Amino acid sequence: MARMHARKRGKSGSKRPPRTAPPIWLDYTVEDIENLVVKLRKEGYSTAMIGTILRDQYGIPTVKLFRDPDNPNRKLTITRILEKHGLAPEIPEDLMFLIRRAVNLRKHLEQHPKDLHSMRGLQLIESKIRRLVKYYKRKGKLPRDWRYDPEQAKLLVR
């Protein structure tokens, strides 16, 4: 598959083994996993970090192998668990990380205004932000009147 802003192919990576059910040796129930996710979120970990901790420390390969107890036709995800318990971030995490990158790059460009490579990088990051904002508005994760503003983004990112 090609990269978004380059005309070349991406690097190949390792693939997860195809599984449809949790491994037999896994002793955790859905309730145990929900409690672990909520506990880790309250400790301040991001969803990506929670998944890594569950994999490395608890031996849970992926949460998606389990079924959502509220809707058995849906896979369980860390984000759904956090939404259910009211711990989901108001701005989706991938969007927040891109906004944080854009803010840091703007700060760099204030000190180095002639850095044209970074200027181009900022344009690409902000294009990704606008594309994600459009998607999240359509899905209802962001309000319809939400806009990306670089000055307001500084306040969003601590």
Swiss-Prot record:
CDD domains membership: Ribosomal_S15p_S13e
Top-level taxon of the source organism: Archaea
Transmembrane segments: none
InterPro entries linked: Ribosomal_uS15 (IPR000589), Ribosomal_uS15_arc_euk (IPR023029), Ribosomal_uS15_N (IPR012606), uS15_NS1_RNA-bd_sf (IPR009068)
GO biological process terms on file: translation
Alphabetical UniProt keywords: Ribonucleoprotein, Ribosomal protein
NCBIfam families registered for this protein in UniProt: PRK08561.1
Official protein name in the record: Small ribosomal subunit protein uS15
